[in-house]
């Protein structure tokens, strides 16, 4: 793992007293670490409202999840589009003030998106599982729960809220965590998009031989800056491996124009996840057509 999963804050016992001692490294080193540390608090709060057992019971009556992989593979638009619903981000603040998830989902489906990604992180992205539920009622497309998943509880909550797929981020999970969380998703018949940012993370994922959807994030999650060079460099090295192993490579973040799309398609990228480019435009339909009508 590239980040610390929890803040160092050792507990000290003196006779019958127990207290926490401020640690010199108790401050998060970057945005990603801060987000992950907050997830522990968020999950504990969720469990106070709905137990894991209750979530599991609710899943029993749900329909089979939609096939995320198949929808991207068979997309009429090339590369297939995972269109994202995102109100805000830590680096940009509020991206879309006129935020209507239902209308956005309907628009995406009508334009030919393969799947929809929904941000569910509340503190940093102003998302929620309630938004995911709203989107589920508004579209028949497969839905990706876009969160910083570190616990099985989040996967069950995502499924209950209508998700067909989850995101697992290699940078915040050990190999054992990745395998365990993938098994949970498999048992629920959910798809898993695993996200990498560099060759080290990608090598880890390929050795696990468990994932057929790999997202190459062009955004450095420590600085939140984007560069398509990340996708291009990894595809230059691993495109043949993806093809032989029937892995769908998906480029995420920093895709702003038709030229970006064409350059990614030409190197073998089969799917793209685009959010901010659509969210910052008043007319999503026009923005979508501007990107895809010319390729």
Swiss-Prot record:
It holds the Pfam family IGPS. Disulfide bonds: none annotated. Its EC number is 4.1.1.48. Signal peptide: none annotated. The keyword Amino-acid biosynthesis applies. Pathway: Amino-acid biosynthesis; L-tryptophan biosynthesis; L-tryptophan from chorismate: step 4/5. The keyword Amino-acid biosynthesis applies. One of its GO terms (molecular function) is indole-3-glycerol-phosphate synthase activity. GO terms for biological process: L-tryptophan biosynthetic process. CDD domains: IGPS (cd00331). It comes from the Bacteria. SUPFAM superfamilies: Ribulose-phoshate binding barrel. Keywords: Amino-acid biosynthesis, Aromatic amino acid biosynthesis, Decarboxylase, Lyase, Tryptophan biosynthesis. It catalyses: 1-(2-carboxyphenylamino)-1-deoxy-D-ribulose 5-phosphate + H(+) = (1S,2R)-1-C-(indol-3-yl)glycerol 3-phosphate + CO2 + H2O. Belongs to the TrpC family. PANTHER family: INDOLE-3-GLYCEROL-PHOSPHATE SYNTHASE (PTHR22854:SF2), TRYPTOPHAN BIOSYNTHESIS PROTEIN (PTHR22854). This is Indole-3-glycerol phosphate synthase.
């Amino acid at each position: 793992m590239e980040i610390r999963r929890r803040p160092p804050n050792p507990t000290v016992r003196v006779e019958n007293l127990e207290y926490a001692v401020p640690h010199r490294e108790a401050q998060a080193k970057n945005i990603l670490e801060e987000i992950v540390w907050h997830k522990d608090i968020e999950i504990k709060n969720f469990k106070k409202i709905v137990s894991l057992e209750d979530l599991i019971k609710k899943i029993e009556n749900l329909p089979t999840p939609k096939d995320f992989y198949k929808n991207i593979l068979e997309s009429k638009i090339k590369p297939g589009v995972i269109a994202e619903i995102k109100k805000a981000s830590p680096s940009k603040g509020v991206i879309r003030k006129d935020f209507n998830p239902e209308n956005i989902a309907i628009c995406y489906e009508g334009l030919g998106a393969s799947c929809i990604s929904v941000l569910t992180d509340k503190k940093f992205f102003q998302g929620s599982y309630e938004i995911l539920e709203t989107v589920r009622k508004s579209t028949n497309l497969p839905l990706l729960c876009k969160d910083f998943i570190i616990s099985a509880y989040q996967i069950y909550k995502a499924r209950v809220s209508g998700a067909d797929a989850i995101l697992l981020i290699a940078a915040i999970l050990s190999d054992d965590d990745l395998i365990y969380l993938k098994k949970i998703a498999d048992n629920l018949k959910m798809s898993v998009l695993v996200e990498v940012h560099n060759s080290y993370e990608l090598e880890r994922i390929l050795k696990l031989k468990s994932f057929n959807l790999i997202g190459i994030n062009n955004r450095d999650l420590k600085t939140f800056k984007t560069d398509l060079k990340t996708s291009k460099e990894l595809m230059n090295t691993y495109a043949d491996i993806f093809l032989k192993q029937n892995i769908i490579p998906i480029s995420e973040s920093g895709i702003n124009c038709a030229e970006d799309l064409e350059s990614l398609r030409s190197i073998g990228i089969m799917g793209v996840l685009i959010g901010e480019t659509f969210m910052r435009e008043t007319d999503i339909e026009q923005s979508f057509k501007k990107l895809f009508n010319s390729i």
